[in-house]
Amino acid sequence: MKDLLNLFNQQRQTLDFDAIKIALASPDLIRSWSYGEVKKPETINYRTFKPERDGLFCAAIFGPIKDYECLCGKYKRMKHRGVVCEKCGTEVTLAKVRRERMGHIDLASPVAHIWFLKSLPSRIGLMLDMTLRDIERVLYFEAYVVTEPGLTPLERRQLLTEEQYLTARQEYNDDFDAAMGAEAVYELLRTIDLQSEMTRLREEIASTGSETKLKRLTKRIKLIEAFLESGNRPEWMVMTVLPVLPPDLRPLVPLDGGRFATSDLNDLYRRVINRNNRLRRLLELNAPDIIVRNEKRMLQESVDALLDNGRRGRAITGTNKRPLKSLADMIKGKQGRFRQNLLGKRVDYSGRSVITVGPYLKLHQCGLPKKMALELFKPFVFAKLQRRGLATTIKAAKKLVEREEAEVWDILEEVIREHPVLLNRAPTLHRLGIQAFEPVLIEGKAIQLHPLVCTAFNADFDGDQMAVHVPLSLEAQLEARALMMSTNNILSPANGEPIIVPSQDVVLGLYYMSRALENKKGEGMVFANTSEVKRAYDNRVVELHAKVKVRITQVDVEAGGKRSSGTSIVDTTVGRALLSEILPEGLPFQLANTEMTKKNISRLINSSYRLLGLKDTVVFADKLMYTGYAYATRAGVSIGIDDMLIPDEKKGILTEAEAEVLEIQEQYQSGLVTAGERYNKVVDIWSRTSERIAKAMMDTIGTEKVENAKGETIDQKSMNSLYIMADSGARGSQAQIRQLAGMRGLMARPDGSIIETPIKANFREGLNVQEYFNSTHGARKGLADTALKTANSGYLTRRLVDVAQDVVITEIDCGTTEGLIMTPIVEGGDVVEPLRERVLGRVVAEDVYLPGNDEEPIVTRNTLLDEAWVAKLEDASVQSVKVRSTISCESSFGVCARCYGRDLARGHQVNIGEAVGVIAAQSIGEPGTQLTMRTFHIGGAASRAAAVDNITVKTTGSVKFNNLKSVAHASGSLVAVSRSGELSVLDGHGRERERYKLPYGATITAKDGDAVKAGQSVANWDPHNHPIVSEVAGFIRFIDFVDGVTVIEKTDELTGLASREITDPKRRGAQAKELRPIVRIVDAKGNDLTIPNTDLPAQYLLPPRSIVNLQDGAAVGVGDVVAKIPQEASKTRDITGGLPRVADLFEARKPKDPAILAERSGIISFGKDTKGKQRLIIKDTDGSEHEELIPKYRQIIVFEGEHVTKGETVVDGEPSPQDILRLLGVEPLAAYLVKEIQDVYRLQGVKINDKHIEVITRQMLRKVEIVDQGNSKFLNGEQVERQRVIEENARLVKRNELPAKYDPVLLGITKASLATESFISAASFQETTRVLTEAAVRGTRDNLRGLKENVIVGRLIPAGTGLAYHAGRRKASGLTDSEMETLSGKPAVAEPVAAVADAGADEE
C-alpha cells in the first residue's frame, strides 16, 4: 500500500536498459546528482542522535530519518508528502531515499584523481606526455611547471625548481605562467586541444623510426582517440567537486554504552571536509604561501585516501591500527561489492544439515528432516492452512505451526508433494554439485542422500554437510524438474560417460554374485528360465558361483522401437542368471554375462542409456543398487591380516637386486661410471625389482589352485577378499596392495627426487625405524600438497570460467568448412585413444571416403557421429577424419551447434542457448584437485621404468616409416639419421596399431613395408650414448684436434683401447677458444667428400664431452659411428606435471628454455660462433638466409647439411605455444594444447572430452594483432577482438578500400579474461581498479552480452531458458534494424535468419 501511494514520487527507476556505459563525471554532472553541499564534518548529535545540519548525515540534503516525518517533527503523516519543512529543511518522503541521494563537497583547490594518476599506465601522464614522477612533484608542491611559456625560451610542461622559477621570474617578469599543485595540472589538461594534438601525433608516427618512440606515440594516440570518441574532457581527471556517498550506504550505528560503530568512509570524508574548510579559511585570510601549499597537499592526500587508501604512501589507519577501507576497497577483491554481493548472494528459503545414506530411496528422491521441511515450506503451509479454514489469519496459522499440531504435518505432506528441492554440496566444482530431488519427509535431523549421486556431489558420509534450497516460482520449479533433476543428469558433462555408477559396496556385491568358480555345488545343471534358477538357489540346491546353463529370453529393440524376442541357452553362473532378472527389456544379456567390475557396470549403464533411453536406465540403476547391497550383505566380505599373502619369491628377487646394486657400486668406486649414472642405475634396478615383486604378489594373491569337475588341478582367480576388492574396482588398487603385501619400494623426498635406498618391507611385515623415517618424508609433503592443491585448483577453475563465461551456443550452423583433423592417439605400442573415441559426438567437416576409394563417401559432411556411425568408420578402418571444432567456428558471438557437436550430458546435438563455455571450464577445473602438484624429475624411477633401448612390436602387421631419413649400413640394416623419424605398425586394414619414435643413430632391422610378427625386434640403439653417424664412406681426418687443449687422450683400463674426449671450450685457454674440433671424411686422395644430394662437405662438428674411438685416417663405412656423446651429459630436465603444468599451458607461458623451431624451411649450416653462442643458419630454396644465435649450453639436434621444414625443432626443449602459432598456425597449436593437457589428465586417469579444451583455446585466440592497418581505424600493433576486425574489413571491402591485415595472438586465460569486451566482467575478475580506470577513460559501453555481466546487473543470463527471455525483451522493445545497429555498433543483417536460429540471431 505504502509503495502504491508513493507511485507518483518514485525515484527515476531504470528497469529496461540494453547497455551500461561508464565515463568520467564532469563537475556539473556531479553537482546535478547532488542534493546539497556537505559543509561540516559533523555526523550526528551524540545526545539526540539526530543528524547535524550541513553535516555528513544532514537530513536536509539526504532526506528524512523516518518515513514521511521531517526532522523537527513539524510535518508527520502521508498527507504532507513532498513538503519541504521550512524549519529544518527536510523533505517529507520515504526514509529509503537516504540510500540514493548524494551530496557533494566543493573543493577549495582542484585535486588529481588518484586512479588516473597512479593506476599504470598513468592516464594523466600519457595525456600530458610527462613522467609520473614529474607530475607527482608538481602535485605535491615540489616543483613548478610552465603552463604558458609566452614569448620566453621556456618550454610548455617544463619543470622548474624553486630557484629556477625565481631566476626565470626575474629574467622574464610576467611573460610566462608557471604554477604548482593540482591547479597547474588542471590548467595543462584544460588547454590541450585534442584534435590538433591528434593530427600532430599522426604526423610524428609517420616520420619516426624508433621502436620505443612508436610505442609511446601509439599509446598516446589511443588515449586521445578514446577521449575524443567518448566525449570525456581531460581536465575531468582532476576533480573540483567531490561527490558524497548517500549516508545509508556508510551507516553510523549507535552501540550500547554511548559508542558508535561507523563505516570507515565517514572518517575519510571527515578528514577531507576538515582540510577543505581549513584551506578555504586560509585562502580567505591570505595566509603565507607555504602554509596554503601544505594545506593543499594535505587535501590532495586525504582525497587520495578516500578514493583509494594505500595506493600512495602509507595507508591512513583508524583507531585500531588497521588501514581504513576506502571507496576502491569497497568494490575490489573477494570481499568487495562485485564478488561478495553481486555475483553470489545469500538466499532465503535454505537450510543445511549433515548427510547420511538413504539406500532405500529412489534416484529422484532425497530424505528431508520434518523440522527442516516445515521451516522451509512455512509460507506454503500457512497459505494452505488458511485455504482449508483451519486457521483464519496468518497469525493463527503461525500458532498452529509452532505447536506442531497433527494437521500441520498432513498439510506439509501435501505441500511437499512434487515440489522439488535443490541440494548443493560445497565446493560446487561443476554443475552436478547442485541437483534437484523430490523430498521425502523423514524423522531425525540429517538429510538422506541417494548413494548413486555421491560421485557427482563428491560426497561421502563422514560428516559432510549439504544445503537445501527451495525453488519458489513455478518457472523455477519447472526448471528444477526438467533440467536439474538427478534422474536427468545421468551422464557427466565432462566426458559423456555415466556418472550415476555404483561404487564400493554395490560393486562388491555385484562382482561377488557374478564371479564364476570351479566345481561348486550344482555345476553343470540346466535350467528352463531364471525363476527356476532362483528357486534352486533359494533352496540351496545350487551355489551362487556355480557354472550352469540357463534358457534366457532375449528382447531386441530396434531403432524404430520395434521389438523382437528370441530364446537361447546360455553358459552362465547362478549369480549372473539372477542378475539378468533385473536387466531392462532390450538390453543384451551378454553385457551382464561377465564379471561385474566397476568398468563393466559403467559400460552396462552406458549401453542401457544409449539403447533404451533415460527412464529405463534410471529404474535399472536403482535396481542394480538394491541388488548390489543385498548380495554384498550376503557375501560378508571383509579383510583380515591373513589375506595379505607375501610371495615366496620375494626373498630371491631382493637378493638378486642387492647383488646388482653392489656391482654398480664397485664399478663406481673403480671410476667406470659417474655418480649420476650410478644413482640412475640403482634407482632403475630398484624400480624394476619393485615391479617384479608386485607381479609375484598379485599372482600369489590373485590365483589359487583348485580341482575342477574332472578332478584336474587348475589355476583360477582367487576369492581373496583383498583381491576381490581391488579387482572389482570397489576399493583399493594394485599400488596399495603392493604396499601391504609386496614391498613399499622407492620413496620420494619432498622436492620430488628419489631416495635411492628403497623400503624393502611391506606393511604386513612392518617397517623398521629407518624405513619409517624415510617414508614420512613423502607422506608429509603429500598432506601439505593437498592443502595447496585445493586452493590452486579452485583458482584455475575461476580463471577458466571467467575466460569462457560468454561462450554460448547461438546458432545451428555457422557454415564453415574448416575443422581439425582427428587421428587416433598412439603412444609406443598402445593405442591410447582410438579414433572412435576422439570423433564420437563430433560433426564431420568434409565427406569421409573409404581409404583408396573416392567414389562413394561413407559419411557425408555435417553428420553428427553417434555410436552407430563410429562403428561404421571403424569397420571401414578409416585413419583420419576432419571434424568441426569450436576453434574454427565462425559464429560472431558464441559458437554454433554444429561446430560443438553432441551435448555430452544429454547425448544429442547441443541445444541453442547451452552455456558450453562454463561447462568446459567446470569440466577442466573439477578434476583439478585430483591432479598432483609436484614436478617430476626425469631420470628418477618414479617417472618410468628402465631406459628403452629397442623396439619390439606387439602386433603382427607391416612396418611403415614416417618422415625418417636413413642410410644403409654395410651389414644390410638401416641407420636412422633424422630426429623426428617414427616407425608405425599397421594391421591388415592399414590401420595404425603402434607408433614409436626412432632416435638418431638407431639401427633398424626391418625395411619400409616389411611384414613383422608380434614380439619381433625391429630396431635397437644405445640408450646411454648419442652417436654421430657417417653418411658417406671414406677416411677420417681430424681438424683442430690439439692434444691436451681441445682433446684429451684416455686409455680404458679394462680394454686398453685409446679414446679421445673433446674438452669443454670454457676450460680452454683464450687462444684455443676459437678452435672447433671437427671430424671430416675424405676420399683416398684426401679430397673432401660431400653429403649425398647436397653440396655440403661431409664433416661433423664435435660437441664438448664427445668421445672419438677411431684414429686419424681410419676408414669408415656408411652408417658407421664416428663419435659418441654420453647421454648422461644431457642434463635431466624437470618436467612439470600435474596442476602447474595445466595452468602453464592455459596461461600460455613460455617455457624456461623453449625449443627453438626453424623459422623457415631450408638447409642447416653453422656460422662463426660468438662468445657464448653458436650461430645457426637456415638457407632456404631461393638462397635467402635466416640466422639464429643459440646459447652454447643448448643441445642442437640438427646437423650441418640437414634439411628442416618450417616449424621443425632444431634445438631441444619444450616448444613455446606462441612459436607453434606463429610458425605452424592455429590448428597445430590447438592440437598441441589438447595433447599436452590431455597427457596430464590421462596420467591421473581422468577423462575429459577434447571439446572442452578447444572451447578454452578458442577464447585464448580471440584477439588478433594488426600487422597492416590498411584504411581501417586500427593502428599497427594494436590488439583487437577478431570479430571487430572481421566486421571492419567487411565494411572496407564493400567500399573498395584496403582491409587491415592481422595475425592471431595467443593470450593466457588471465590476460584473455581481462581483455574481454565487457568491462563489468573484467572488473569483477581481477585488477578492478585498472579495468575501471581504462573503461572510464574510453567511455566504454558494456552491451551485457556475457553471463557474468547480466548476473551483476540482476537479470536472467542470456543462456539456457534466459535466451528466449532476452530475445523476447528485444522484440518487445520494438527496436528497428537501424536502432539495433546503433546499439550494437555493427551493421544489421539483412538476409532472413532461419526460424530455429531466431533466438540466437537476436543475441547481438
From Swiss-Prot:
Pfam families (UniProt xref): RNA_pol_Rpb1_1, RNA_pol_Rpb1_2, RNA_pol_Rpb1_3, RNA_pol_Rpb1_4, RNA_pol_Rpb1_5
Positions of Zn(2+) 2 binding: 814, 889, 896, 899
Binding annotation for Zn(2+) 1: 70, 72, 85, 88
Superkingdom of the organism of origin: Bacteria
Keywords: DNA-directed RNA polymerase, Magnesium, Metal-binding, Nucleotidyltransferase, Transcription, Transferase, Zinc
GO annotation terms (biological process): DNA-templated transcription
Chain residues that bind Mg(2+): 460, 462, 464
E.C. number(s) listed in UniProt: 2.7.7.6
Free-text comment on the cofactor: Binds 1 Mg(2+) ion per subunit.
GO CC annotation: DNA-directed RNA polymerase complex
Alphabetized GO MF terms: DNA binding; DNA-directed RNA polymerase activity; magnesium ion binding; zinc ion binding
Cofactor list: Mg(2+); Zn(2+)
Keyword hit for Cell membrane: no
Reactions catalysed: RNA(n) + a ribonucleoside 5'-triphosphate = RNA(n+1) + diphosphate
Keyword Nucleotidyltransferase belongs to the record: yes
Assembly information from the UniProt record: The RNAP catalytic core consists of 2 alpha, 1 beta, 1 beta' and 1 omega subunit. When a sigma factor is associated with the core the holoenzyme is formed, which can initiate transcription.
Task of the protein: DNA-dependent RNA polymerase catalyzes the transcription of DNA into RNA using the four ribonucleoside triphosphates as substrates.
Family: Belongs to the RNA polymerase beta' chain family.
Name listed for the protein in its UniProt record: DNA-directed RNA polymerase subunit beta'
Organism: Xanthomonas axonopodis pv. citri (strain 306)
